[in-house]
């Protein structure tokens, strides 16, 4: 369906096929001690799935914003490849929105969930539907979409994947060199539902309130009445450490 993606130096690709899950494979490879920069991917006809392995050198709280770097990297990559009228936004729990409808998500896992510990590894995953799950009834779920439904049929998965990794690298480098201020400024311009009422589900738990912004490490601030509470970015970590 597509050519092999082109990655920046120090990044190495590992292609999967069939139903194999790149996010799960990347976690397995990380546990086995693979090098940082491994990009595991599965480019199917109906969806793009990929995951990048990172090796943080800072405690988990300071490492988690790499998820934001990856999300902004994807937005920048798709924004550069898609027609100019296509709008791409991000929501705090990792969702991707294209022209206002949900279109895939980011995922994250790490070797620890302890805020003060330095993770051995951190994996960020991307899942992006290319065509609707139900092609017989397009428009049946107006709040959800797929990339090719939004005028992006000329964006090939291999090109988009390579661009995602390149743009992510730019933001990871900026985060390391300049701190979180540039990342925060970019993200605020892309954030979905900022200043609005939200209801987010985390497993069996639901958090609701007015999304008023983030703290210095991109934890979400939700206001309910006179009370404002913090949801750390580590709340998005999947699975057991």
Residues covered by each model-derived region:
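Long, positively charged amphipathic alpha-helical accessory segments at protein N-termini or as interdomain linkers
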Residues: 2-40, 59-65, 72-83, 101-241
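Hydrophobic residues embedded in beta-strands of well-ordered beta-sheets
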Residues: 48, 96, 219-220
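Primarily the active-site beta-strand->alpha-helix module of PP2C/PPM metal-dependent phosphatases
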Residues: 40-55, 59-60, 68
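A structural signal for short, well-ordered beta-strand segments
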Residues: 50-52, 94, 124-128
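Catalytic palm active-site di-aspartate
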Residues: 88-100
């Amino acid at each position: 369906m597509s050519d092999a993606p082109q990655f920046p130096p120090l990044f190495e690709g590992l292609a999967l096929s069939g139903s194999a899950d790149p996010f799960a494979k990347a976690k397995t490879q990380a546990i086995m001690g693979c090098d940082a920069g491994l990009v595991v991917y599965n480019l199917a006809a109906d969806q793009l799935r990929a995951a990048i392995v990172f090796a943080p050198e800072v405690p988990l709280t300071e490492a988690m914003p790499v998820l934001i770097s990856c999300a902004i990297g994807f937005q920048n990559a798709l924004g550069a490849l898609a027609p100019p009228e296509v709008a791409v936004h991000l929501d705090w729990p990792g969702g991707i929105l294209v022209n206002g409808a949900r279109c895939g998500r980011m995922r994250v896992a790490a070797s620890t969930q302890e805020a003060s510990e330095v993770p051995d590894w951190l994996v960020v995953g991307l899942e992006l539907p290319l065509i609707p799950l139900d092609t017989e009834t397009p428009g049946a779920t107006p709040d959800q979409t797929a990339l090719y439904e939004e005028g992006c049929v000329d964006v090939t998965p291999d090109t988009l994947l390579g661009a995602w990794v390149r743009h992510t690298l730019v933001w990871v480098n900026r985060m390391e060199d300049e701190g979180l201020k540039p990342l925060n400024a970019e993200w605020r311009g892309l954030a979905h539902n900022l200043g609005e009422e939200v209801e987010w589900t985390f497993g069996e738990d639901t958090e609701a309130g007015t999304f008023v912004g983030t703290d210095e490490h991109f934890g979400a601030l939700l206001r309910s009445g006179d009370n404002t509470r913090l949801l750390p970015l580590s709340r998005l970590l999947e699975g057991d450490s």
